Amino acid sequence: MATNAKPVYKRILLKLSGEALQGTEGFGIDASILDRMAQEIKELVELGIQVGVVIGGGNLFRGAGLAKAGMNRVVGDHMGMLATVMNGLAMRDALHRAYVNARLMSAIPLNGVCDSYSWAEAISLLRNNRVVLLSAGTGNPFFTTDSAACLRGIEIEADVVLKATKVDGVFTADPAKDPTATMYEQLTYSEVLEKELKVMDLAAFTLARDHKLPIRVFNMNKPGALRRVVMGEKEGTLITE
């Protein structure tokens, strides 16, 4: 397969789900997966790519589930946001151990734990090739971490949002349930909406569409997939205008 000599993106926003960090355990953080992801991010930095990362928190806490059981949704979402900060701390530690300069920012001020999110500071760090980990979602309840990824992607003027998942891309149906499901290589925003494909929640997706922010869905569990994506090779599903 032909490989471009240079990466096709200069600045990316990588969206990692909390589940991506839990490995086969089904809960918590798998240290070996964390270290592998840190190495893959390090490769991007060495290629000269500026990397922003938004991490979910579903491996530690899910607010929506407890909301159904009667917990106040705002309280549940605040707990979920704090779970993303815990994941961010773990990822920052893994990056530091891999000798990658990384800064953790939170949309909720947590003095003494990490920096508060500042758009200007994030841009400045990215320009200096620091990996910027963006935690606590948007800082508001009722918004998913996918919404946070698209919002931060637009704010930092990323070339693309790379949504790392457990499947190879966007399929015609759920590949786990339907063996005949096939993967799309490329889609437009309108096609995703027309076909009602589950890429991300509607608020997040329409935000990306309105700001013409491309989204690429790929499988982070495939070693080297992240590098192949940034080098412009066929990997995952690309969603653009």
UniProtKB/Swiss-Prot annotation:
Annotated binding of ATP, by residue: 15-18, 58, 62, 165, 171, 174
Region of interest: Involved in allosteric activation by GTP: 23-28
Keyword Transferase among UniProt keywords: yes
Residues that bind UMP: 57, 77, 138-145
Reaction(s) this enzyme catalyzes, per UniProt: UMP + ATP = UDP + ADP
Main location: cytoplasm
Localization terms from the record: Cytoplasm
Job of this protein: Catalyzes the reversible phosphorylation of UMP to UDP.
Protein name according to UniProt: Uridylate kinase
Organism of origin: Shigella dysenteriae serotype 1 (strain Sd197)
Gene: pyrH
